[in-house]
């Protein structure tokens, strides 16, 4: 909740969940950058590339900034169908088999929710020994990434 309050003025969502149908335990603090606030970024299997833009940020930019402070964040878990071992196997989307159509990723057709979460999401430092002051520094670092 502290991250959620501290980042409320940024174009991000913290631990999105259905308040009517679920009750999370919040053991991990995850954040998703709103689509229109995403700076250009590409993630490969072992490396990444991003470009900073005023008013926007990317998960990798934020993770690098947090790391420079000496704290550890990480990307949200990579969906299995994007991992090399499973890359050629079928997967299910809300519209059926994601590998069953040759145009599954053309705008206006298949929606790959897992890939979108992986692209725009990250896990923030979270430890039961983290102080409020340490969390405040992480919140400030994230604000700076959007400037």
What is each model feature region?
Residues 1-147:
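PLP-dependent aminotransferase class I/II
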């Amino acid at each position: 909740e502290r991250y959620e309050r501290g980042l409320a003025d940024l174009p991000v969502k913290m631990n999105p969940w259905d308040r009517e149908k679920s009750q999370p335990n919040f053991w991990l603090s995850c954040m998703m950058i709103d689509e229109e606030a995403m700076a250009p970024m590409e993630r490969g299997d072992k490396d990444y590339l991003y470009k900073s833009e005023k008013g926007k940020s990317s998960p990798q930019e934020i993770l690098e900034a947090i790391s420079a402070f000496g704290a550890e964040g990480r990307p949200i878990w990579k969906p299995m169908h994007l991992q090399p071992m499973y890359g050629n196997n079928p997967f299910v989307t809300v519209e059926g088999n994601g590998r069953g159509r040759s145009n599954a990723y053309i705008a206006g057709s298949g929606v790959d929710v897992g890939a979108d979460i992986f692209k725009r999401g990250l896990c923030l430092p979270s430890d039961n020994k983290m102080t409020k002051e340490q969390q405040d520094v992480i919140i400030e670092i994230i604000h700076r990434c959007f400037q």
